[in-house]
């Protein structure tokens, strides 16, 4: 069996990580995978993994920051993009097309329909959730409003994030040695991670700064690359900025608590590491995803004004939060294989 995976974005962020994990899951079951990225994408994640890809047009469309006007504009770009996708699908003669999030989901879905091939969409945005379910089977990631209701719309089912190999099996000693490289780090203190994923949003910086000013009894870590230049100019001197790291699986086994935005694959990787979480809500474009409702009992959610209090609450309720995180860890780690089988079953 051969599959084409159509991926939105630049080939280096969270969407690409999700796509790569889907590819690994499919290949483990004997499926040959071809990759399609936007022609302008540097594809650094795939390059690092030694992968090649096909270049087509995959407009950024319907992301969480999308407005009605930008979504309409993106829809026109989609029209030409889907015909180019159809040509690639026919040329490769694949058995199934998997579109991953936003523009990737839509281009893959419509392209597959035009080429007369079955498709599966991984959806997570307002626009892909409107278009893709009308054309093929869809799997909604936890941020989607469709994740919790008992009766889902036709063609939409749930999926957790497919996770990378090694998640949940990191080595805390490796993380400790890395952290010791910072003169600010004190291994006798508890350690709290602040992160909004690969890109650092202003809200998570504010949260780290506020807590650093409130207490000096913890190591406060900040991970990621700033979304905009200048975001780190006012970073509190007591915050340890690690930048973008490739040893996150090790770090998650060392730290005592994670303060994350209420979305994204990092949240589930943290749960897979059996670690309690405080989610800082409405950081990314003001959106609210109710992750505490999806992963009940493992997450405390907070706004910026209550964050310091909720961090201390998380330590007070640590044992109960950890017990529930352990419960979700097993399901999270099984998702990659389970989702791959569901995709294969669409063809069968």
Which residues make up each language-model segment?
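Nucleotide-sugar donor-binding and catalytic loop/hinge architecture
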Residues: 1-2, 171-193
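Conserved nucleotide-sugar phosphate-binding/catalytic loop shared by glycosyltransferases and other
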Residues: 5-12, 24-77, 84, 240, ...
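Acidic donor-binding loop of glycosyltransferase active sites
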Residues: 94-96, 253-262
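Active-site-proximal region of nucleotide-activated glycan assembly enzymes
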Residues: 117-174
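Donor-nucleotide binding loops and adjacent catalytic segments primarily
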Residues: 185-252
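Conserved donor-nucleotide binding/catalytic region of nucleotide-linked donor-dependent transferases
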Residues: 304, 312-328
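C-terminal alpha-helical cap of glycosyltransferases
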Residues: 317, 331-348
